[in-house]
Every structure is written in C-alpha cells, then in structure tokens.
Amino acid sequence: MIAESPTFIEQPITAISPLSIRQPAVTTRLRKENETEVLRFLTERPLHNAVMTGLIRDNGLESKFNRGTFYGCRDGSDALVGVALIGHGVFIDARCDDALQEFARLAQEFPRVHLLMGEQDVVERFWKYYAPHGQSKSRLCREVLLQLSEPPARPDDSANLRLAHLWDLSRVVPVHATMAFEESGVNPLLVDPVGFRQRCRRRIEERRTWVLVEHDKLIFKADVISDSPEVVYLEGICVHPEYRRQRYGSKCLAQLTRSLLGHTRSVSVLVNEERRPAQEFFKQLGFVSRGLYDTIFLRTETALV
C-alpha cells in the first residue's frame, strides 16, 4: 500500500532569495498547455501546495470552479519560480522574492479578494508587498498544519461513516455555513446563498463529503478538499455538540483516514492555533505538526464566500 512508504517531510521556505540572474521576473496567466509543468512544480512541495494541486487535478488550470486565475512567474532562463492562484482566495508558492512581489502586485488588482492563506513566513513577506501602507486586516486566523502518514489503530467498534448523498444536503449546508462564519466572520448563507449551496452540492456529487447520520442528526462531517497521490487535505471536520467526547469523532476520523491512506501517502488538516483540545484530538490519532499557517481575511460583510 502507498501508506506504507516512508514518511515525507517538507522543509519550509525559510528564506526567499532574489533571482540569481538579475533579469526582470515575468508573470503571465497560466494556460492548459502549462498544466504538466505547473503540477511538477507544485508537487515538489506537495504538503504545502495541496489546495492548488487539488484544484488543478479536479478542474484544470482554467475553470470557473477555481474561483480565480492561475499565474506563473518565470526567471531569466524561463524557469518557473512561482505559481499563484488569485481570485476569491490567494494561494502562493514563490521560490524567490521577485515572484512574491509580482503576485502581490497582481493581487492588488483584484478588489474582491476575500482571503490570503499560506505558510506563516510567506504570508508575512507577501503582506509587506501587498499592503505597504499598513492596510488593516479584517481578521487573522493562525492555524497548525498537521499531517498523518500512518493509519490510526483500529478502534474496537467502527462508525457507520458513509459518503454523503444529495438528500443530506439540507443537513450539510447549515453546519458548513456555521463553521465558515466562526472562522471568517462571514455568513455565506447571507452573502452568497445560491453559490454556497452549489459548492456544497458539488462536493457531494464528487464523492468528497463524508457523514455519519443517526436519529436524523448529522453527527460527523468531513470534506475532502484536495486528493492526490501525495496528500489528501481535509476541511470542514465537525462533530455535533451533543455527541462530543463520546468517541464519535475519533472513530469516524480513524475510519476515514485509514480508507484515504490506501491511495495517498498522507492526510493533512489545519487546526486553529488557539484550539488546543482539537489539536490534541488529532495528535492522539497520530497526526504530527508540520508548521504554522496564516489566513488573512480581507473583507467581511461584503465578501463572497
């Protein structure tokens, strides 16, 4: 099984250096014909590029479902030194300072950017270029990146976890909306109810949402945001408040991650730095910390989620 291969640990970019050849960096919109090159670039750091890699694998480089545009930055020898998705959200892998500056300039031209998400040091550097005059942040969320590379021990009893069906949509939507509001301060059911429901529906149709339903209640939910041979990235993990501390969460997540590790090398999640009990919950299942991530929410009431 792939899950039995050696654990891979990516080293964070601790210093972003200028281009070795002092020729102007060139940034262009990426097209379908660039897809193989871009995926090769992103999979050099698969853990940190899970979101962008997943979107490209699911939708291609050019798709409305990406909710933005992919750009590539090249050095004087025409080699990729950075890839970014800029639109509703900003996601970046910049291997040099020039690329980071180029992406910040581009992002300034998108007035409806809602969030910026990435490794803590990269986000800090990007922000200096993006907001040189000290623009305020609507909200900053710091999270711990956790990674699981070995299947959790099998519990004594398993949960009836299953893929969600379309008839579960009415249960999934309000729960997911509540989680989004708690993190961003934006209620997606107020600012973009149709689009939000469509995205929840699409995840179900693509077999990416897992649920446990008992007594007509949604007990557990998790969404597969990105699925690749290197890493599966999960979001939207929650347990109904009335069923917490009853092992529902650990049983469901253990069952889900064992299944996922049958076709991927690792599973990753982001957990709010302030939620220590949640971090301990994941660590008890075998997740280990791989660094800090920052998400800067740029707009609140007028944001499109």
Residue ranges and their predicted role:
Residues 111-119, 231, 260-271:
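Conserved GNAT acetyl-CoA-binding A-motif
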Residues 117-123, 269-280, 296-304:
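Conserved beta-strand-loop-alpha-helix junction that forms the acyl-donor binding cleft
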Residues 157-227:
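A mid-sequence, solvent-exposed acidic-amphipathic segment
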